């Protein structure tokens, strides 16, 4: 299979900071019938993020947006931003997204999604 045809799957786990996050794809029908969501971050051990598998399998901008959205919930939780001021929040998200994009297991999937579209 040529490099252009390579399929990069969403990883099963992403390690970021002190957390190892399990990524779980759930059937579209379950996501929408249970609570009308596309993704859900669970902020209690073991930390998990649930994704509508239909959106993830379609790939592209919607999938990237969904994944980044749910990981931003993790960043909010990880950096305890609930009662923080703007500069602290912006700095925390800058640090979190840099780690997510540059050093996590998600990097290859994100790059593949960007390059194929």
Please report, for each region that a protein language model flagged, where it lies by residue.
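Alpha-helix boundary/interfacial micro-motifs
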Residues: 34-35, 69, 86-87, 104, ...
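Short acidic, Pro/Gly- and aromatic-enriched capping/linker segments at domain boundaries
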Residues: 2-12
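Acidic/histidine-enriched, beta-strand-rich ligand/metal-binding domains
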Residues: 99-106
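Juxtamembrane/interface helices at transmembrane-helix boundaries
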Residues: 1-2, 18
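Long, well-structured alpha-helical subdomains associated
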Residues: 108-117
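Active-site scaffold of zinc-dependent metalloenzymes
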Residues: 10-61, 74-78, 82-96, 117
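Catalytic glutamate of the conserved HExxH
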Residues: 66, 70-74
């Amino acid at each position: 299979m040529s490099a252009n045809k390579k399929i990069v799957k969403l990883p099963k786990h992403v390690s970021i900071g002190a957390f190892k996050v399990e990524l779980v794809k759930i059937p579209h029908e379950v996501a929408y019938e249970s609570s009308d969501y596309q993704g859900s971050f669970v902020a209690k051990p073991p930390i998990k993020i649930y994704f509508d598998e239909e959106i993830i399998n379609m790939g592209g901008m919607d999938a990237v947006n969904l994944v980044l959205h749910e990981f931003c919930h993790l960043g909010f939780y990880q950096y305890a931003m609930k009662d923080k001021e703007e500069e602290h929040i912006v700095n925390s998200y800058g640090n979190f997204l840099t780690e997510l994009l540059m050093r996590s297991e998600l990097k290859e999937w994100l790059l593949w999604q960007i390059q194929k579209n």
